[in-house]
Amino acid sequence: MSPPLEPHDYIGLSAAAASPTPSSSSCSSSPNPGGEARGPRLTLRLGLPGSESPEREVVAAGLTLGPLPPTTTKAASKRAFPDSSPRHGASSGSVAAAAAACQDKAAPAAAPPAAKAQVVGWPPVRNYRKNTLAASASKGKGEDKGTAEGGPLYVKVSMDGAPYLRKVDLKMYSSYEDLSMALEKMFSCFITGQSGLRKSSNRDRLTNGSKADALQDQEYVLTYEDKDADWMLVGDLPWDLFTTICRKLKIMRGSDAAGIAPRSIEQSGQSR
C-alpha cells in the first residue's frame, strides 16, 4: 500500500497565509472586539482642499413646531429668527393696544374741517384768484377811506409833446389858479406863448360866444378825465367836487380841444 500524498509548499503560500499583511489590517473597517485602535474616520465635508473645518457635534433633531435650539458655533450655524418667540403673546397684546389707540386718534380727524367760505358757481374759483379779488377789494376800500379822511390824492399829468408824465397831489392846492401855476412851472420848457394854461378870455365868459373861438385864443388848455372816463375842460365844477371826480389831467393844445367844452357852456348852448 502506497503512502498518502502530502501537499508540498513549493512557492511559499502557506507562510503568506499564516502571517497577515499590515495593509489588510489597516484597511479593515470591521470592529475589533479585542479593543485595538481603529483607523481614522472618513467624513464628507464642504471646503477647500487641505482646509480643516472645525469639529461639529452631531445632534439628532426631529421634526417639531417649536423654536430652533440654540446654536453652539457661529461658523456652522445658519441665520434663524431671533429668540423672541416666548414673548410673542406679550408683544401681540401691546401691538393691539397701540393699534386701538391709533384708531381712537384717527376717528376725530376723519371729519372734514369746516370751510371758511363756500365757493358758489362753476367752475370753482382758485385760491389765488380769491386772494387777488379780496386784496383788490380791500385796496379799493383803503383808497376810498384815505380819500375821505383827507389823505393825499395823486393824479397823473400828461402834456402833448412832453416825453414824460408827472404826478400832483390835488389836496395841496386850493383853487384852479394854484393848480394852473404849478403845472406851468412843471412843464415850463414845453409851454411857450401863453402865460397861463387856463386864462379865460372875454369870449369864454360870454354865453353867446362860440366855444371853438374861445379855445382858439389859447395855445394850451387843461383837461381832466372823470369817473365815467370822459374828458372835460377844467373849471366847470366847484373845486371840492373836482378833486373827488378827477382821475387824470392832460395839457392839450387849444386846437385839439375844440370838441371839448365845460358842462356849463354846453348846458347854456342847449338851453338857447
UniProtKB/Swiss-Prot annotation:
PANTHER family membership: AUXIN-RESPONSIVE PROTEIN IAA17, AUXIN-RESPONSIVE PROTEIN IAA5
Region spans: Disordered: 1-92
Quaternary structure note: Homodimers and heterodimers.
Principal cellular location given in the protein's record: nucleus
Function: Aux/IAA proteins are short-lived transcriptional factors that function as repressors of early auxin response genes at low auxin concentrations.
Tissue-level expression: Highly expressed in roots and flowers. Expressed in shoots.
Pfam families, per the entry: AUX_IAA (PF02309)
Alphabetical keyword list: Auxin signaling pathway, Nucleus, Repressor, Transcription, Transcription regulation
Compositionally biased residues, Low complexity: 14-33, 40-50
Localization, UniProt: Nucleus
Motif EAR-like (transcriptional repression): where in chain: 44-48
Origin superkingdom: Eukaryota
Induction: Not induced by auxin.
Name under which the protein is recorded: Auxin-responsive protein IAA5
GO cellular component terms attached to this protein's record: nucleus
GO BP: any one term: regulation of DNA-templated transcription
Residue span(s) of domain PB1: 152-256
Family in the record: Belongs to the Aux/IAA family.
Organism: Oryza sativa subsp. indica (Rice)
